[in-house]
Amino acid sequence: MSEFTLEPLYDYPQREQVLALARTHADAVDRGERSPFENLREIAKDGLITLGRDGGSLVPQVSVAFDLATEDASTAFSLWAHRSTIAFFDAVGRELPAGLADATVSGTTAMAAAYKEASGLAPIKVEGTLVEGGLKLNGSVSWASNLYPGGVIVLPVAVQNAPESHPNRYIVTVRQDVEGLSIDYHRNLLALNGTESGTLKFEDVFVPSEDVLSDNIEAFLHDVTAPFLLVQSSFCLGLAAGALQEAAKHLDVSQGVFRPEFPLILAEYQSLREELVRLASEPARAERRDLLSLRLGVSHFATIATHFELQVVGGAGYV
């Protein structure tokens, strides 16, 4: 008998339709026969990919990502990258490029390098050179997702020839099919096969001045970290919740050898769930340390939960 009930983070009116949509198309998305953006366009009709843009609670938005992840990891992951891109434009008070709000144009976040450099882990690998009317980009981004033709990409750039005492780190936006940008797509990805992920290579890509979103990378990261990490955390927690739901159906296999572990795992799940809702309720007041701690915690927990599911469900073959 199941000892785990998958409760919503927030019971929005369209929840059952979202779950049914993800469940129905999960296999086709994973096989590459259906784009996650077909799902996102469906839920965008009800405004479910632009929740919380007013700076208030992000609980409804993280709830949608959580629910998608319990059924379809690729669509939930694509929502995170797309919603983060929307947050980047909101953070600098820019109007959204046409198509982002209804997912007819994809949004790609290539911001990992900015966070790595801010943490002292690695430098930004895309370099910019100031030229008349803008700058030219050269370098690479090792991983980005939602790489569809015409898509909107946001990334950090290390400017090499900035005047002394001027900012030398920019946040810029480019289109996926801009001249000089090539993509090496990653295929056969575990759980994320439908996300159109790949490596970006920039060769003299011109960015006009109006496509520089910010030259204050510290302030920019401060403003976008909450939506960026909270939606990402909800994706991880939803993936874990889906694994626990499946494992709970098989706790009596192999003479119930795995059953004693389950209450401990559930306690950790409940703790992370409560912290996610707490931080998402007032994202503007969330401390960076708490956001990072949650993100690391749910990532680790997703590994534990999926491994537990593999043990328990796999054990059914030995009954």
Predicted regions and their residues:
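Glycine-rich flavin
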Residues: R34-S140, S145
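Alpha-helical interface subdomain recognition
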Residues: S2-S63, S233-V319
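A generic structural signal for well-ordered coil/turn residues at beta-strand boundaries
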Residues: V105, A122-I124, P149-G151, N168, ...
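Short loop segments at secondary-structure junctions
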Residues: V92-R94, V131-E132, A158-A162, Q176-E179, ...
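A generic structural signal for beta-strand entry/edge sites
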Residues: E132-K136, V152, S197
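Short glycine/serine/proline-enriched coil/turn segments at secondary-structure junctions
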Residues: K116-S119, A144-L147, P163-E164, A191-N193
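A short core secondary-structure module
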Residues: S140-L181
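Glycine-rich beta->alpha junctions and the first turn(s) of the following alpha-helix
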Residues: R187-Q270
